[in-house]
Amino acid sequence: MSDISKASLPKAIFLMGPTASGKTALAIELRKILPVELISVDSALIYKGMDIGTAKPNAEELLAAPHRLLNIRDPSQAYSAADFRRDALAEMADITAAGRIPLLVGGTMLYFKALLEGLSPLPSADPEVRARIEQQAAEQGWESLHRQLQEIDPVAAARIHPNDPQRLSRALEVFFISGKTLPELTQTSGDALPYQVHQFAIAPASRELLHQRIEQRFHQMLASGFEAEVRALFARGDLHTDLPSIRCVGYRQMWSYLEGEISYDEMVYRGVCATRQLAKRQITWLRGWEGVHWLDSEKPEQARDEVLQVVGAIAG
């Protein structure tokens, strides 16, 4: 696309970053200055009743800066990158039609990628193939199927944990139906995002600082009633660890504690470690991201001013 045709597209802002990096605070600050409306890009914040463990913006923050695509699914429901792209495009069109600018804020990098590049059509689920995979898992175990996936599709196998039957089953199913691996199918993207996008990533300058913030925030969540929040989900009786909602960082570890599998101290340790691992994956994604402007979360005023400097011209 030429620079001229790009310039004629509506504007959008991406504000990406690892967990606990101050994305929400910066987005709320920017909304006071720029004609933006916020869209959440987070696979955990979509769930109702999961507020504390996801660090969902509180009522006061949402009053100051409403976020779209929050609380749109029950924890029993799935939500794919394709679902997100469809919903985000609809919200972006609505915001643009009102003469304002979509500001997409969050840390689910797969969602940002799907939105920016489009999605390749994957084969539809096949009940017979799925049943065959599940039967094999029942007989041999999911670790055996993970080894099989390593031989077929080592790239997907590296991304999928052996204890993640939903994603593991889907990766194998896609190969058995199409004869192609997930990376092969996703190399050809669908429709690119029809917006002129300014992309920012915010993070602390040092990994140690981010680790400290993650640990502090996890303890703050516990002090704010995180255990009671998960107990309420646990008591429903229809939720389990195969669901994406309960596999969210923090929730999975608290669930193991409530099931009596680990001690409270072990839950805290694992929760902090899992959150740090999530942040590491997010930063790895962002380091390979093209055209991103990095911001230092320890200098919030400077970060705000840098965004304004880059996008200020579009505010009028």
UniProtKB/Swiss-Prot annotation:
Concerning InterPro entries, the annotation shows: Dimethylallyltransferase (IPR039657), IPT (IPR018022), P-loop_NTPase (IPR027417)
Q: Which Pfam families match?
A: IPPT
For ATP, which residues are the binding ones? G17, P18, T19, A20, S21, G22, K23, T24
Q: Where is this site: Interaction with substrate tRNA?
A: T108, R130
List the residue ranges of the region (Interaction with substrate tRNA). 42-45, 166-170, 247-252, 280-287
Q: Which Gene Ontology MF annotations are present?
A: ATP binding; tRNA dimethylallyltransferase activity
Asked if the keyword Aminoacyl-tRNA synthetase belongs to this entry, the reply reads no
Keywords, sorted A to Z: ATP-binding, Magnesium, Nucleotide-binding, Transferase, tRNA processing
Q: Its family?
A: Belongs to the IPP transferase family.
Looking up NCBIfam families in the UniProt record yields: miaA
How does it associate, per the subunit comment?
Answer: Monomer.
Q: What is this protein called?
A: tRNA dimethylallyltransferase
Its source organism is: Escherichia coli O6:K15:H31 (strain 536 / UPEC)
What taxonomic classification does the UniProt entry list for its organism? Bacteria, Pseudomonadati, Pseudomonadota, Gammaproteobacteria, Enterobacterales
